[in-house]
Structures are given as structure tokens and as C-alpha cells.
């Protein structure tokens, strides 16, 4: 089983980012970041402030309760009006009802998973929206490539991450087509650069940047959908063959070794990697191990849990003046 003690070390990283967002206007961005941190099993080591925790879960319960009473149209319209990062302003106002349903469901699933993972009670009427029929409909929509067709050039990475994960759920015996996934992420990243001038990200053309950003959301979405589907189905066999989280993490490690380390100077990338480490990868792997009694046998990859290789990579990264220290901490420890 995976050792979660590294979450204690991660507390200083989380504190650093909380300090970074301390003076942001409004509370939504703070809440967004706290929500992301809450997705990991180690949240007790990170969100030790009882007021922050209380605020987080009160906010989540309130949002979930409100959205369970809304139609898919209402949820979509609210989402379009809440554009604090500026990346939805170009999304078409008129879209297929299936698209509205898809994004509404992913929103509900994310909120529900936050509560489930904290042992919180969820509203009794949750089954009106998150049920087997709707989950299967989401999978069908994603597998039809409707999202990429109807929102081409205007969707955002959360949607693509959900699309990739749902394709894995539907076709979990098919090897991952990394070239296709990379192509999707490259297109989305170009959209960010062209349309989102207000977002303070470096305009890196490095493919690894696109790759890791997209994979971050894939890991989070995979973990969310896994939790939601298992909760609804109460079945340990539904995702027996889905072990792609291992491939995601291993590919990230492999890719970074031959990349331009200068991109790790980007604080946003450091946050993406922190998100993988805290919110998605470790948790999804742990759940797969626990529910399926599977050993993912990371030792066979000689990448992440091989002490000798890990230390060598650590020294290599530390020797490079452009490497972001937060990256080293969250990806190696």
C-alpha cells in the first residue's frame, strides 16, 4: 500500500500557495484552490485550520444542494456567467443539450466526490442526478466525440480531461493513444494562449507543458469518476482493468527527463504537479489497489518508487538552476 506520510511534507508547499492567493480579490479563487487541496486523502495534514475546513465543506454542501435543484440549462448559464479566469468568454452561448448535460454532470460529480472523500453526508436526492443512467449517458456522450466537435477550439481542459477518462472507462482494455491525447492538449493550450490574455501563464510552446497540464486534469477526473461510479454502482469490478493512472505518472516522469527544465520556473506548472501529487494520482492509485486488490507493481517501471532512480533524478533536478523547487518537492517526495 502507498505511504501517505509525504502529505506532511507537502504542508509547506500548500502553505506557500495559500500565501500566494491570500491577497486575491474575492474569495472564489481561494475557495477553488482549497477545494482542489481537499481532494487528497492527506487533507488533514494540509487544511489544519478548522475555519478553513469548515468554510470549504459548507461551501461544497451549499453548492451541491443548490445545483441539484437546477436544470442542466441553468447550470450551464451559471457556469458561463462565472468566468473569473477569463477562459470561457469565447465559448459559444448556444450548444447542444448533451454538452450542457455533460458539463453539469462533471460539476456535480466533482462536488459530490469532495464530500464523499471526507466522509460527509450528501443530499438524499443525489440519485436524481448522479445515477447509473446518467453516468452511462455521460460516457456515451464522451465516447461519441461530440464534445470535441461541438466545442472545437472553445472547450477547456477540464472537459478534455473528462473526455479522456471516460473513453478509458468505456474502452478500458484499449491501450492509451498518447499521440491523440497530446494532440487534444496542444490544441487546447493554443486556445488558452490566443484567447486568455488575462491568465498569467508563460507562453511556453514546450509540448511537455501542454502534456502535463492536460494529464493533471485527466488524473483528477479519473479519480472523481472512479469514486462516483463506484459509489453509485457499489461494484468492485466496474473498473477492474483501469490502471492507467500508473501510465500517466510514469509518462510524466519519463517525459520530464529529456525536457527543457526552464519550464519548471512557471509557478502554474508547479501547481499542476502539486495537484497531481495531492489530488489525483496517489489517491486514484490507492483506490484502485484497495478496491481491486491489485498490485500496480511500480517497481517494474523503475521510475517512481525505485529509490535509486528517484534519488538520481532528484540530484539531476537540483543541479539545474532553472528547476522549480516546488516541482522537486511534490513530484519526488
Regions found by a protein language model. Give the residues of each.
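Preference for long, amphipathic alpha-helical scaffolds in soluble/luminal domains
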Residues: 1-333
Amino acid at each position: 500500500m502507498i505511504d501517505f506520510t509525504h502529505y506532511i511534507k507537502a504542508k509547506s508547499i500548500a502553505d506557500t500557495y495559500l500565501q500566494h492567493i491570500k491577497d486575491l480579490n474575492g474569495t472564489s479563487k481561494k475557495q477553488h484552490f482549497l477545494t482542489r487541496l481537499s481532494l487528497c486523502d492527506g487533507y488533514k495534514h494540509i487544511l489544519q485550520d478548522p475555519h478553513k475546513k469548515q468554510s470549504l465543506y459548507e461551501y461544497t454542501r451549499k453548492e451541491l444542494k443548490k445545483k441539484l435543484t437546477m436544470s442542466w440549462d441553468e447550470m450551464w448559464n451559471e457556469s458561463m456567467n462565472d468566468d473569473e479566469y477569463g477562459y470561457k468568454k469565447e465559448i459559444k452561448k448556444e450548444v447542444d443539450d448533451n454538452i450542457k448535460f455533460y458539463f453539469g454532470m462533471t460539476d456535480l460529480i466533482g462536488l459530490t466526490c469532495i464530500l464523499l472523500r471526507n466522509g460527509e453526508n450528501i443530499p438524499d436526492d443525489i440519485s436524481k442526478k448522479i445515477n447509473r443512467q446518467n453516468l452511462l449517458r455521460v460516457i456515451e456522450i464522451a465516447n461519441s466525440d461530440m464534445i470535441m466537435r461541438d466545442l472545437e477550439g472553445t472547450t477547456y481542459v477540464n472537459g478534455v480531461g473528462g473526455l479522456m477518462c471516460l473513453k478509458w472507462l468505456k474502452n478500458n482494455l484499449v491501450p492509451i493513444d498518447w499521440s491523440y491525447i497530446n494532440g487534444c492538449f496542444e490544441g487546447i493550450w493554443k486556445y488558452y494562449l490566443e484567447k486568455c490574455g488575462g491568465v498569467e501563464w508563460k507562453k511556453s510552446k514546450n509540448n511537455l507543458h501542454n502534456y502535463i497540464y492536460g494529464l493533471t486534469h485527466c488524473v483528477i477526473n479519473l479519480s472523481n469518476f472512479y469514486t462516483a461510479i463506484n459509489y453509485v454502482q457499489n461494484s468492485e469490478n466496474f473498473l477492474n482493468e483501469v490502471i492507467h493512472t500508473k501510465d500517466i505518472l510514469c509518462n510524466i516522469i519519463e517525459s520530464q527527463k529529456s525536457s527543457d527544465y526552464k519550464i519548471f520556473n512557471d509557478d502554474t506548472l508547479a501547481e499542476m504537479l502539486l495537484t497531481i501529487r495531492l489530488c489525483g494520482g496517489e489517491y486514484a492509485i490507492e483506490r484502485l489497489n484497495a478496491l481491486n486488490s491489485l498490485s500496480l507493481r511500480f517497481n517494474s517501471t523503475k521510475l517512481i518508487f525505485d529509490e535509486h532512480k528517484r534519488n538520481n533524478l532528484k540530484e539531476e533536478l537540483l543541479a539545474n538552476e532553472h528547476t522549480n523547487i516546488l516541482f522537486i518537492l511534490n513530484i519526488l517526495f
